[in-house]
Amino acid sequence: MPLEPSVRVVRELTSRGYNADREAVTLLAGADDPGAAVERAVAAAAADAATLTVSDVRAVLDAHTASSAAQTSAPASTPPDEATTHTDPSATDTPPNHDGGRAATADARSVEIDGDMTGASTGTGEYQDFVSVFRDRYDRLAAQLRGRVNHRPTSALASMPGGSDAAIVGMVNDIRSTTSGHWRVELEDTNGVFPVLVLKDRDVSDLVDDLLLDEVIAVSGTLADDGTILFADDIYFPEVPRTYSPSTADRSVQAALISDVHVGSQEFAADAWRSFADWLHTPAAESVEYLLIAGDMVEGVGVYPGQDEELDIVDIYDQYETFAEHLKDVPGDMEIVMIPGNHDAVRLAEPQPAFDEELRSIMRAHDARITSNPSTVTIDGVSVLLYHGVSLDEVIAEHPSDDVTYDDPQNAMELLLKKRHVAPPFGGRTRLAPEAEDHLAIDTVPDVFHTGHVHKLGVGIHHNVRLVNSGCWQHQTAFQESVNISPDVATAPILDLDTLDITVHKFS
């Protein structure tokens, strides 16, 4: 399949030891003769330059245009039939001006990143750090619940007369069933702990299955006659408002949502990746201007027992070098945003800061934006919450419903949206870092929630928020087979930013 001029430009520059700004690549690719334009830009580059800027390229192109204009007004010294023409054989089937599709809309794009905590980690592991993060979590989520119930602090409930109507906003400290089949839930606020009893024959008991430790909820009900326990009538989650109206783009533009590439694994689906990258160069994908990657760019090392036997590339830096080469197959004029995952070379505890400078430099050729896990990226006015998704393991394991499974990861994602937190339980399967503030709380409702990690495709809608778990690019490993994981390989959900419709493309 013929390569897009922007990709040929990037490869030509890389072969000569140069990087270039995205805008510079676009200018070079849009030249009448991209190959000759690269020659002139490299020849004019400063001796110590490693990256060509848009100013460098524009100066070269402007100078050439002025020179060509002068030659056109002078008598021709070379007969037309003797003029030298540079032709790239790979471009013979490329429609005229096809590369101008994305380049022509580059100025219309907008990318904003919120919640990036890279370089802002304050946790030291001291006791006060844990106090700070849980107090911040309580304050953030309680603020979303206080307008829905007439709550009282735990200290005030203890002094209220028995039989009174009451409500409390608290963090779930404990959940256990009684010998009679009822549920006893302990809620904690900044003043103390108060017990709640959920009777098994009440409708509200159906919500107990959705509860997770350390999430913040509100409960309304009636105090027992002795005032020592609250009988629950209703349970409230921070939730997404039912009337939530998501934002959309004001032009026809799309984003590809992928995750779990796992370069370095023997099971990396290299052929499928090439098919995906080739498709991005076709007219059918011309509207796909953004690529959002939700973690696990590489397979990593030492992630699980016996992983070394399943590695094709054993050095972690070599894995990222190879991933960067595969990323170059993607059109050079696409905007790329990525977050790390649990296989990437960052700390395991969440939130995960983005890659260090050494890894960033490896992936610099495509000028990808790299942010922390989780982060919210707003593209063309549409906010997308990117979270790798390790906590989905815990939600799926703890929830008794047959609807919350690995085969339907969007249902577990829906529960996280209800709780307005991407990883509520502390001390379980998901490692959480104590920080001065809770970076895992969902303060602002996103228009789209994109996760990965479980290697399964899932698409859904919750209160008008689109949910996408994007599958993976790794065939089943021996480890996955041992834990009965059958991955959805080479899937790329394509999000229409102007309608929020989602179309899944398969490249295996």
Swiss-Prot record:
Family membership: Belongs to the DNA polymerase delta/II small subunit family.
Function summary: Possesses two activities: a DNA synthesis (polymerase) and an exonucleolytic activity that degrades single-stranded DNA in the 3' to 5' direction. Has a template-primer preference which is characteristic of a replicative DNA polymerase.
Subunit structure of this chain's protein: Heterodimer of a large subunit and a small subunit.
Recorded catalytic activity of this chain's protein: DNA(n) + a 2'-deoxyribonucleoside 5'-triphosphate = DNA(n+1) + diphosphate; Exonucleolytic cleavage in the 3'- to 5'-direction to yield nucleoside 5'-phosphates
Superkingdom to which the source organism belongs: Archaea
Keywords, ordered alphabetically: DNA replication, DNA-binding, DNA-directed DNA polymerase, Exonuclease, Hydrolase, Multifunctional enzyme, Nuclease, Nucleotidyltransferase, Transferase
Residues making up the signal peptide according to the UniProt record: none
Record's compositionally biased regions (Low complexity): 66-80
Record PANTHER family: DNA POLYMERASE DELTA SUBUNIT 2 (PTHR10416:SF0)
One Pfam family it belongs to: DNA_pol_E_B
Originating species: Halobacterium salinarum (strain ATCC 700922 / JCM 11081 / NRC-1) (Halobacterium halobium)
One GO term (biological process): DNA catabolic process
Coiled-coil regions, chain positions: none
Its EC number(s): 2.7.7.7, 3.1.11.1
Protein name: DNA polymerase II small subunit
Annotated SUPFAM superfamilies: Metallo-dependent phosphatases
GO cellular component: DNA polymerase complex
Any one GO molecular function term: DNA binding
